[in-house]
């Protein structure tokens, strides 16, 4: 499944040419708009015109966690605050949170990326998708929310918690796809069984899981418990959020199909 087929099926040579063009543009843009990067790139002796191939990325000084914290909250923003329409932040469990600002254009690109990984996982505009990530400063819930809406799916923004009500919505709305952490998806399944809810009442066929690791054993439990096909996706607040990558293992049909 594709959302933007012309991009997702691009020839390798064309993709690398596009990546090089955008790498050079990004370096030049950061140099001109973020004083921190002006200084850092000057010290490294690197500029956009010196980048001749993708392998030259090794000459670009990395941005560290310390850099993000030292420039908290808005020191690395490349656009004026009046253009920011949303701000997200990491949890900051080991220090100051990583703060990310989004322009309208950023949000549009972000939703494109999420729509791509959702489509690659098998989501379509016919799906009813229940989001059981917690909404808030965390990028996961709103990231998947807007990407799935762009794909054309019907989104149920249930959030996390109140599991019994979430199960009621899932059954009554005919939810076909679930966005959650793997552990919460498993907990929901166990709760449904404890409440003696017939699993045949549920129409789940796809799981879009993330925000934590998932062992093969846990994945198997979720797939067998719900009768869905479980996929994982990856993201980080420093790079918008979910949509960076989607992991899909083409191993077998869904357990719902008798695999």
Protein language model regions, located:
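Gly/Ser/Thr-rich phosphate-binding loop
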Residues: 199-248
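Phosphate/pyrophosphate-binding loops at sites that engage ATP/ADP/AMP, CoA/4′-phosphopantetheine
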Residues: 192-199
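AMP-binding/adenylate-forming
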Residues: 100, 104-117, 128-187
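Short helix-loop-beta connector
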Residues: 123-127
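Nucleotide 5′-phosphate-binding alpha/beta core
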Residues: 1-89, 94-112, 119-120
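Residue-level signal for inorganic ion chemistry
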Residues: 30, 178, 235
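Single conserved hydrophobic/aromatic residue that forms the stacking wall/gate
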Residues: 250-259
